[in-house]
Amino acid sequence: MLSLSKNWNTLIKPNKVAYENFPETNNKAKIVVEPLERGFGLTLGNAMRRVLLSSLQGAAITSIKIPAIEHEFSSIPGVKEDVSEVILNIKGIEVKMHVAEKRIMKLKATGPCVVTAGMIETGHDVEILNPDHVICDLAKDKQLEMELTCKVGKGYVLSTNSYEDNLPIGEIAIDALFNPVKSVTYKVENTRVGQVTDYDKLIMFVETNGDVLPEMAVGLAARILQEQLQLFISFEEQEEDKQVKTDTLPFSPYLLKRVDELELSVRSANCLKNDNIIYIGDLVKRTESDMLRTPNFGRKSLNEIKEILAKFNLRFGMDVPDWPPENIQELSKRYEDSYN
């Protein structure tokens, strides 16, 4: 019977996730994942994007209360904007909550002034992430008082679908955007593994409002997908699939990996092939001097390989006991899941 684990263990797995923040802010990041099987870049990119934009928990203002104002079609004395415009501006306030329970914030201002989100009294449990955000213009000698209710939730909740069924008279429900992720885009490019150049590289650009960092948002989205997909695994692995046979080797199974699977330049790969260096174990037993005596192998190729080996705590001139093993091809195939 075909081993079930062959369905996933024979696929190439991403071994590199790079996060790069933009210099002007920590709220934007470029995330690069590689290598992926061809087609998996689009599959994972689309799934991650949808989860990032819909399913993460965040905080938002869900209702406001202004003295003597009972609905959004009113006007506020001394305020240039009507209540509908004020509500629209309040929807743009980005908040972060440190507790799960709702909190009521207060705003008091005296004109003339431009009322901003930074004037809101939040207490210790809530932060305003965009304090310069404009709420309204207040005329001279006029006062504005307001209570704003802040809650934790997910997605986009319309005021008409608010879970606050019985708001007190004078309290106005507003649309709430809880999601801390503001935008997600992605693209897929080719990447190279060994001599194969058409694997996928997934590049995502994620921007948040500062409630969570992009790296954390991506991790949360991946965990959500993992939890949702777990139910579909309706079989048990065979015992042979569960066994990890690593107790008989006197060296790291990574040394059984073929050098043509490394991301080497064509020149370096050809030099190793011509010198009959097939496995990483063959490679690390050579000294730097040995390598520089290889025809057409120069200092640039040496530094390229040293950099790759260093990622796995390997180096030239290593003492590898019992290398090469007699059944090296069989061992390489058996342990391929350990080093991929």
UniProtKB/Swiss-Prot annotation:
Reactions this protein catalyses: RNA(n) + a ribonucleoside 5'-triphosphate = RNA(n+1) + diphosphate
Region Alpha C-terminal domain (alpha-CTD), annotated ranges: 251-340
Enzyme class: transferase
Region described as Alpha N-terminal domain (alpha-NTD): 1-236
GO molecular function list: DNA binding; DNA-directed RNA polymerase activity; protein dimerization activity
One GO cellular component, as annotated: cytoplasm
Domain of life of the native organism: Bacteria
Record keywords: DNA-directed RNA polymerase, Nucleotidyltransferase, Transcription, Transferase
Entry EC no(s): 2.7.7.6
Biological process according to GO: DNA-templated transcription
KW Ligase (keyword) present: no
Keyword Lipoprotein: no
Family per similarity comment: Belongs to the RNA polymerase alpha chain family.
Function: DNA-dependent RNA polymerase catalyzes the transcription of DNA into RNA using the four ribonucleoside triphosphates as substrates.
Domain notes: The N-terminal domain is essential for RNAP assembly and basal transcription, whereas the C-terminal domain is involved in interaction with transcriptional regulators and with upstream promoter elements.
Subunit structure: Homodimer. The RNAP catalytic core consists of 2 alpha, 1 beta, 1 beta' and 1 omega subunit. When a sigma factor is associated with the core the holoenzyme is formed, which can initiate transcription.
Name of the featured protein: DNA-directed RNA polymerase subunit alpha
Species in which this protein is naturally found: Rickettsia conorii (strain ATCC VR-613 / Malish 7)
